[in-house]
Protein backbone atom coordinates (compact mmCIF):
# COMPACT_ATOMS: atom_id res chain seq x y z
CA UNK A 1 0.00 0.00 0.00
CA UNK A 2 1.38 3.42 -0.99
CA UNK A 3 1.04 5.93 1.84
CA UNK A 4 3.00 9.03 0.74
CA UNK A 5 0.85 12.18 0.98
CA UNK A 6 2.91 15.41 1.25
CA UNK A 7 2.37 18.82 -0.28
CA UNK A 8 4.37 22.04 0.04
CA UNK A 9 2.70 25.10 -1.48
CA UNK A 10 3.60 28.77 -1.26
CA UNK A 11 1.31 31.64 -2.08
CA UNK A 12 -0.80 34.50 -0.84
CA UNK A 13 -3.85 34.28 1.42
CA UNK A 14 -6.75 35.45 -0.77
CA UNK A 15 -9.78 34.95 1.50
CA UNK A 16 -10.30 36.10 5.07
CA UNK A 17 -9.38 33.31 7.52
CA UNK A 18 -12.29 31.73 9.39
CA UNK A 19 -11.53 30.65 12.95
CA UNK A 20 -13.76 28.09 14.68
CA UNK A 21 -13.64 25.71 17.62
CA UNK A 22 -15.09 22.23 17.13
CA UNK A 23 -17.58 20.76 19.64
CA UNK A 24 -14.67 18.71 21.03
CA UNK A 25 -12.73 21.94 21.72
CA UNK A 26 -10.21 21.73 18.87
CA UNK A 27 -9.46 25.11 17.25
CA UNK A 28 -9.46 25.31 13.45
CA UNK A 29 -8.44 28.07 11.06
CA UNK A 30 -9.52 27.90 7.40
CA UNK A 31 -8.31 30.10 4.55
CA UNK A 32 -7.59 29.95 0.82
CA UNK A 33 -4.03 30.15 -0.52
CA UNK A 34 -3.49 31.42 -4.07
CA UNK A 35 -0.36 30.12 -5.82
CA UNK A 36 1.17 31.55 -9.01
CA UNK A 37 4.48 30.48 -10.51
CA UNK A 38 6.34 29.59 -13.67
CA UNK A 39 7.19 25.89 -13.93
CA UNK A 40 9.08 23.86 -16.51
CA UNK A 41 7.26 20.97 -18.16
CA UNK A 42 8.54 18.95 -21.13
CA UNK A 43 11.32 21.49 -21.56
CA UNK A 44 8.92 24.43 -21.83
CA UNK A 45 7.95 27.16 -19.37
CA UNK A 46 4.32 27.32 -18.34
CA UNK A 47 2.28 29.32 -15.88
CA UNK A 48 0.98 27.41 -12.87
CA UNK A 49 -1.93 28.78 -10.86
CA UNK A 50 -4.31 27.41 -8.25
CA UNK A 51 -6.39 28.34 -5.23
CA UNK A 52 -6.08 25.77 -2.46
CA UNK A 53 -8.30 25.65 0.64
CA UNK A 54 -6.14 25.22 3.76
CA UNK A 55 -7.16 24.09 7.24
CA UNK A 56 -4.97 24.45 10.33
CA UNK A 57 -6.07 22.40 13.35
CA UNK A 58 -4.93 22.07 16.95
CA UNK A 59 -3.70 24.34 19.72
CA UNK A 60 -0.02 24.18 18.79
CA UNK A 61 -0.65 25.57 15.30
CA UNK A 62 -3.01 28.39 16.23
CA UNK A 63 -0.36 30.92 17.38
CA UNK A 64 0.87 31.47 13.81
CA UNK A 65 -2.67 31.74 12.42
CA UNK A 66 -3.42 34.93 14.38
CA UNK A 67 -1.02 36.86 12.14
CA UNK A 68 -2.59 35.52 8.92
CA UNK A 69 -4.76 37.98 7.00
CA UNK A 70 -5.65 38.53 3.35
CA UNK A 71 -2.40 39.30 1.52
CA UNK A 72 -0.13 37.34 3.89
CA UNK A 73 2.47 35.31 1.99
CA UNK A 74 3.01 31.78 3.31
CA UNK A 75 4.60 28.43 2.65
CA UNK A 76 2.38 25.61 3.89
CA UNK A 77 3.59 22.03 4.46
CA UNK A 78 1.01 19.31 5.00
CA UNK A 79 -1.14 16.61 3.45
CA UNK A 80 -4.18 16.71 1.20
CA UNK A 81 -7.58 15.17 1.82
CA UNK A 82 -11.00 15.32 0.23
CA UNK A 83 -13.81 17.21 1.98
CA UNK A 84 -17.44 17.02 0.95
CA UNK A 85 -19.37 20.27 1.12
CA UNK A 86 -23.00 20.75 2.06
CA UNK A 87 -23.78 20.87 -1.66
CA UNK A 88 -22.46 17.32 -2.05
CA UNK A 89 -19.44 18.38 -4.10
CA UNK A 90 -15.99 17.20 -3.06
CA UNK A 91 -12.92 19.41 -2.94
CA UNK A 92 -9.25 18.87 -2.15
CA UNK A 93 -8.10 20.57 1.07
CA UNK A 94 -4.52 21.05 2.30
CA UNK A 95 -4.24 20.16 6.00
CA UNK A 96 -1.37 22.30 7.29
CA UNK A 97 1.20 20.73 9.58
CA UNK A 98 3.75 23.55 9.30
CA UNK A 99 3.31 27.17 8.19
CA UNK A 100 6.13 29.58 7.39
CA UNK A 101 5.48 33.29 6.97
CA UNK A 102 7.32 34.67 3.92
CA UNK A 103 9.03 38.00 4.59
CA UNK A 104 7.78 40.44 1.96
CA UNK A 105 10.89 42.59 2.40
CA UNK A 106 8.98 45.68 3.55
UniProtKB/Swiss-Prot annotation:
GO biological process: DNA replication, synthesis of primer
UniProt similarity note: Belongs to the PriB family.
Biological source species: Pectobacterium atrosepticum (strain SCRI 1043 / ATCC BAA-672)
Record bears the keyword Hydrolase: no
Name of this chain's protein: Replication restart protein PriB
Gene3D superfamilies referenced in this protein's UniProt entry, alphabetically: Nucleic acid-binding proteins (2.40.50.140)
Domain SSB, chain residue ranges per copy: 4-103
An example Gene Ontology CC term for this record: primosome complex
Amino acid sequence: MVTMNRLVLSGTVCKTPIRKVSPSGIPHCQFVLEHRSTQEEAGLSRQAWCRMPVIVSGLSSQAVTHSITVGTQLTVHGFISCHQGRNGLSKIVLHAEQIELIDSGD
